[in-house]
Amino acid sequence: MDSPFLSIIVPVYNGESWVTPAVDGILSQTRPSFELIAIDDASRDATSNILTECCREDSRIRVLTHKTCLGAGPSRNDGMDIARGKYLLFLDADDLFEPNLVESVATEAERIDADMVLFGADEFETEGEWRSNRFFLVSDLVPAAAPFNRNDIPNRLFQLCTPEPWTKLFRRDFAMENGLRFQGLQNTNDMLFTLSGLALAARVGAVPDVLVHHRVGRPGSIQASRGRDSLAFLAALRAVKQRLEVEGLFDQLAESFANLVVFHCLFNDDAPASWAEVFAELGVSGLPEHAFWLDGDYERYTRLVLASWEEGNGLACAYGKDFWYKAALLERADLERSAQRADELQRRADDAWRETELVKASLSFRVGSTLTAPIRKLRER
């Protein structure tokens, strides 16, 4: 059997209410050269029956079944281990997808022979509220020329996108050769995989379009089924730092990593006994103000260093509210740039029209038209 261009890996836990629309959205992609690997992570509902029926209807689907719930990270690893595609795409079983998702990312991957391709997403709640999230892919930071890599954006590499795997395409050989694996953490189990990949990739591309619609606020997900460790993100950050040090990349990416650490510490729901000790351990102590990407983060960082446990929690709560304000600012900036580009294109079109009218009105144009009229009539015959 010929290998597919792409392996789409989808972990599922108790997804009877959501998995069918997700699978339908994948199978209806405009570019059909892919396999779908669904990992049933010991679901206790009708998920297994639904996936079995899907397999009967479409030969591109393969199903792995776990006897015990392992979590999203190990499930993705298991799917990756049996994948046959040239590229890997990790999607969630409760999300929705644009029909050109595969075609868009595959086209960019082929165009630049990419190790990774980043793309946009937004969010929606089951009740119907939709919202954009420009942090999934910050178009301001994407280098103009593709492919790009860490050398083009060392101080803001990890601010280019969030760590979620479902906004990224990976070349399978690149992932396997570099030993990229998802952690078995209860949450934040994707950070080591995606950010190590971003740091190591030699050829990265980006598709600015929103191609995934991510469902939020749903109970019963894989992570929810295994409980939540609110400080698991610290283990993930430690692992990322260690990988960067092993690869000799930490110094080059230190400023971007520091922003990553501060962002996640401020946005987290809980606090360790001492943020100062955490920052020291992760190598982000004594940061100057100019090192921070987002306005106000330096002030919050300095306050967090001195904060007690209770104060740290309060800062995190306030930052969470401010996060969506910043996301809205990024979206407004995108819209303003789009409007500016539209104005510039309109100005060029107007200039071209005026130049054309001036040419038509010129004596040389009128004389030339008169002289060539007989020839044009002969051609029309």
Positions of predicted regions on the chain:
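Conserved short acidic donor-positioning loop in nucleotide-sugar-dependent glycosyltransferases
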Residues: I26, D41-A42, L70, A93
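Glycine-rich, basic loop-to-helix element that forms the pyrophosphate-binding segment
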Residues: H66-A83, L96
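Short aromatic/hydrophobic "clamp" motif used to bind/position activated sugar donors
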Residues: L88
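Boundary detector for helix-to-coil junctions that initiate low-complexity/charged tails
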Residues: A307-R381
